[in-house]
Amino acid sequence: MLRYVRAAAEDQARIEQFLGQFVDDYLVHEFPRYLTYKTGGIYLANDDDQLVGLSVIALPKPHEAYLGGMRIRPDVQGKGVGEEFAAFQVAEAERLGATVIRALVPRGNDASRSIWEGLGFRVVEEWVVGTIEDFQGPPYGNEVAGPAWAIDRQRIEAFYEQHPRDLWAMPDPWIPQSLTLDDIWGRLEAGGALVAPQEVGQAVDTLALYAINDRDLTVHYIRSMGTHLKALLEYLWVEARAWGVKTLRFGLPRPQADKLKEAAALPVLNEWRGLILEKQVGLSPQPSI
């Protein structure tokens, strides 16, 4: 019988050893920060004293849960461990207060997709994570695009109302969540929102939300309905150069990721493509682990 525990910092070496069974697994580099989560985090599936599976549960919003990174030990795959572990994750997410649960699975992993669909999930979006490096910015940003200001709120609201079900990923490109106006205002106030065109009297046709540090620039959301995406990217390149950054990271829905790649005209490195599956649940209490 499987026993589930929430991983702690002292489990790090054990998790590293477990993930070593999987080739080129991105989770090897990502999992340590999940151990710091106050809610959710990494969950371990144990059969007696043997680690047979792990997964990540995150709550990017109080009512939204993300389930991802499920790994099942190769020798027990196909024996019902994945199904049982996935059912536990749904119950745990619901216990933590989620009413919307999203699972992220790699494209082509039909076994994982089947597990989640068997639990009532349905595919709602394709998701792409990747990096672009060594981009070259122009001397100055294109004046068509630039920072969003408080004066832009009304036309940003009008843009948002056309896409109320959009997803974004902040701060982690692997963890998609719903985008709200409060999210947009938060990035605007932090200096991490761009719009095009910048003319106040014109409708917004391109909006981007981003963050930048001394290592990379991360695009957390971008949507372009017109012809200004390239101009907006040129402004981003100028911003990145000012910080001495030459790496852009992103986690985006596939249509927007494809537009970004086309406008950047640069190869995407470490590209990962997957499916977002979603399920609505109630608020009935579940037993704690």
Predicted regions located by residue number:
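Conserved acetyl-CoA-binding loop-helix of GNAT-fold acetyltransferases
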Residues: I72, G78-E92, S114, G118, ...
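Conserved GNAT acetyl-CoA-binding A-motif
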Residues: A86, E92-G108, I115, A242-P253
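Active-site rim helix/loop that mediates acceptor-substrate recognition in acyltransferases
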Residues: L19-V56, P164-V195, E199
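Conserved active-site alpha-helix within GNAT-family acetyltransferase domains
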Residues: E83, R107-E125, R254-N270
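Conserved catalytic-core motifs of GNAT/GCN5-like acyltransferases
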Residues: L59, L104-V105, R122-Q136, P267-Q280
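A conserved beta-turn-beta hairpin within the catalytic core of GNAT-like acetyltransferases
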Residues: L59-G68, Q77, Y210-Y221, L269-E271
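Short amphipathic alpha-helix that is part of the acyltransferase structural core
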Residues: M1-H29, Q136-Q177
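Conserved beta-strand in the GNAT
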Residues: L44, Q50-A58, Y66, R71, ...
